[in-house]
Amino acid sequence: MSTDLILLHAPSIYDFRKKTILYGPVSDLIPPSYVFEMYPIGLTSIAEYLGRAGYQVRIVNLAVRMLRDGKFDAEAFIKRLKAPIFGIDLHWMVHCHGSIEIAKIVKKWHPEAKLIFGGFSSTYFYKELLEYPEIDYVLRGDSTEEPFRQLMDCVIRHKGELEKIANLVWKDNHGKIQENPFSHIPTDINNVMVNHYGNVVRSVIKHRDLISYTPVKDWLRYPITAVITCRGCTENCVICGGSAAAFRKCYNRGKPVFRSPEAVIRDVRQISRFSNGPIFILGDLRQAGEDYASQVLNLLQKNRVKNQFILELFYPASKDFLRQMSLACPDFCLEISPESHDPEIRKVIGRPYSSQELEQTLDDALDVGCRRLDVFFMIGLPRQTPQSAIETTDYCGHLLERSRGDKRVSMFTSPLAPFLDPGSLGFENPERYGYHILFRKLEEHRRALASPSWKYSLNYETDWMTRQQIVDTSYEAILRLNQLRVKYEIISEKLAQTSEQRLRAAWEMSRRLDDLLSKNDNEAIDRLKPEVDRINTFPVAEKIQLEVPPPFIKLKPFRALWSLVTGR
């Protein structure tokens, strides 16, 4: 059966295998690599929704394929693909280089095919995207499943009119941009993501192509999955492009819409049929209220699966709530991101709680049986000086000391990089928060991403730190934290030495690249590629530390196949 739509996910930089780029510690605290190969969960939702409407949809993670196989020819692969419509996600801004380069290749070999962009960044930069001749349509918003179906009906079945599809921006036959009303903002999302994980398993079997559906390079070794609870957010974190303010201004969503507790558990059960790996329930369950959180946790307790859970807090929690987490998800992992040790900085960025409240929550989480407790801090915040960022590392030492070296406690810090999110309060109101936005256009961000050093991809400075200070402070703070991990035996001496070697080599390389860039010596920069690539591919201690030890049998292919056959 022919394919109607192929959804492509690009690497952050299309030709990352050829360019000399020192990526820095920009992806150390997330599952994907510096190529940001993870595709948004919206692709699986769209594929499943369109599948129920009778369309044949395929997902291809080009980024993973390019990472896993140095000889993989992305252009030749795209040339062989056949479909009347291609879709490319530009959700996270870090994909703005790769996504557009992939678009050019698609149109080069499939000039008659229609090309659609979608995602948060596509929504924000929709006007600039349609200036590229390769892009025919942009679907705006956080819930484009139904508009996408209507667009497929128009293009494939010649039913309906483009002018009547909500959220669509498109080019007419004369090349003029037409902007339809941005009005499809569903307040009920229980008709999407009904069986999207099951649909992925079915598609893998159908296309005999597991690698194209894997979200990250090492997923087969560490099969972590995610479950979302809502679209939108209740919080207003200054640095986040997914804040309540950003959703109102950029995505037309006045308030978040939540999936039913039953839908959340349905996802968990779908995942448990094919994977024994950890499940990350994204977002603070209390966003929809304490009753909603209790319902989800009660259902998790009643529908027990063997997978380990990673849960998230946006702000401190009561011991009773943490105990409920422990009963529902034994040996759960917990994450919280205060971002700074300084309560005044936390208040400015949207974390208005005291250090005493934070510390009480950490104590209580350990007391009720939390298996691992991850605390995240950040560099590049309003009112944060280099000294303040270093003092945050000292505060990490204080937290480790007061936990008496409990090895369940892990501290992390990283720079706000590569971008301050377009749409975030800091990006939209920089003067208020002390940010200096260095580039605003989509094309400026694209060029910056391809710079030889991560310093030059930063789209901001602050009243308190230059880009150079952000780079230097980041390396110094991470090195200090690395030493604390050794002191409290959180990581091994060997891993710490590897981490220090990587960080110091990267810091020194950033200085060498600065010097060569000041001389405009591009040939010398190109000669450094083997050394830069070696630094980029060093083991990352933080990624290793963040992994939940998976069981020996990580995936359940026969159980997944049986589930597809029987529907159980």
Per-segment meaning from a language model:
Residues S2, R17-T20, K171-T229:
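N-terminal [4Fe-4S]-dependent radical SAM core
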Residues S2-L7, R17, Q56, I78-L81, ...:
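Radical SAM enzyme core and accessory elements
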Residues T3-P11, K82-A83, I102, F258-R259, ...:
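A structural motif corresponding to the C-terminal lobe/cap of the Radical SAM core domain
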Residues T3-V35:
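Short glycine-rich His-centered loop
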Residues V35-S45:
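Conserved alpha-helical elements of sugar-nucleotide-dependent glycosyltransferases
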Residues G42, Y49-A53, R58-I189:
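Glycine-rich beta-alpha loop elements in corrinoid/cobalamin-binding modules
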Residues L43, A47, A74-I78, S99-A103, ...:
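Generic structural signal for well-ordered alpha-helices
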Residues N199-G369:
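Radical SAM [4Fe-4S] cluster-binding motif and immediate context
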